[in-house]
Amino acid sequence: VNKFIAYLAKQFACKEALSKAFGTGIRKPILFKELEILRDEKGKPYFNPLGDVKKTIINLGITKTHVSLADESEHAIAFAILEI
C-alpha cells in the first residue's frame, strides 16, 4: 500500500475513534472536518478540535485527549481517549 493511502487510512481511523469516544459517531456536533489530526515535531499524532467540536469538549469538561495510530500492510487502527 502506498504511504499516502496508509496516511489517509490512519487519519480516517482516528476520526472514527474520536467520534466513538464522544459517544455520537459522526453526526452533529461531531463532524469529520472539525476533527483535525496533526503531528508534533517528532511525528506523534495529536487531536486539534475545531468549531463545534471544540465547544463540545468544553461543555463536556474534557481536559485531555490522546490518540494513537498504527498501520500494517492493508490495515489501519486508531485509539482515542478523552479525559474528564
Q: Across the structure, where does each feature detected by a protein language model lie?
A:
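Core catalytic alpha/beta fold that binds nucleotide/phospho-ligands
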Residues: 1-84
